[in-house]
């Protein structure tokens, strides 16, 4: 499934909301995690950087971050993107659960 199967305006609205969020909290993390499949990998990379930058202000446990990275990895495997697979495996290995 790709983002072409979804209403483009709704996808854009979610993307804009996440890009405009200065401080990410649990809601933004949940929204991102649950809507990963509607974004391309370039957008996911940028949004994951926002997650990483907000980790010190978010009240989440590492299991939530682990699930996000595991889901991103699944998408990277589907796209056969070896560079991103390596990148996110390194991130996954750094997480302490």
Region spans (language model):
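Inter-domain helical "communication" segments and dimerization helices
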Residues: 1-97
């Amino acid at each position: 499934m790709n983002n072409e199967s979804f209403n483009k305006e709704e996808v854009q609205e979610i993307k804009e909301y996440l890009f405009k969020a200065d401080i990410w909290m649990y809601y933004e993390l949940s929204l991102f995690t649950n809507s990963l499949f509607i974004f391309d990998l370039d957008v996911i990379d940028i949004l994951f950087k926002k997650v990483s930058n907000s980790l010190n202000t978010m009240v989440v446990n590492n299991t939530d971050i682990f699930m996000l990275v595991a889901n991103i990895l699944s998408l990277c495997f589907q796209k056969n993107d070896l560079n991103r697979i390596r990148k996110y495996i390194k991130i996954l290995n750094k997480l302490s659960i």
